[in-house]
């Protein structure tokens, strides 16, 4: 795990921990590294899990799919991001999301049940890690609240402007990249891609924005 320490140090989950403490914690939570090719499922809706995933490399999409193949993207996870935390922290919870590899990726699986029970080595940094987990979960709630704000808008135009405005504020810049391609953005905002493309074209003609691929 030594080679992944630069990634782990940057994660909010490990904030305030030394390298030795991080390595000790990985042992406590039965950390296991897996690799998955593009298009494969890491978690499937309908299953349950005791582990959460930490992206070491590559990217994944957290999605919801119905029986007719309609897809709703909840979030995109890149290097250093987590997925599955709420389900792993809730014993017996059934996943209503799936996690799919957007590209070849390396993932570290962490057993949250081991974290939430008494640490067998009684490590001093165990409580700090639990506080960090609470912070990670709270941040995830804020991200989903943002999505609700965007998709609750009445029109495709309003959804686009809500999302792009929020991204501009988040990145503190009027020029920014978004993590989605056009189809993914449509799936994230729960709109039809064709209708979204029409609105983007109108917004450009009106001088409200300039866009090329995922850059605005």
What are these model-derived regions, one by one?
Residues 60-72:
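A short beta-strand-loop-beta hairpin characteristic of the jelly-roll/cupin
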Residues 73-131:
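Cyclic-nucleotide recognition modules
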Residues 41-47:
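Short phosphate-coordinating micro-motif centered on Lys-Gly-acidic
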Residues 1-38, 87-91:
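Cyclic nucleotide-binding regulatory module and flanking cytosolic helices
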Residues 39, 50-63, 78-80:
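Glycine- and acidic-residue-biased ligand/ion/polar-headgroup-sensing regions
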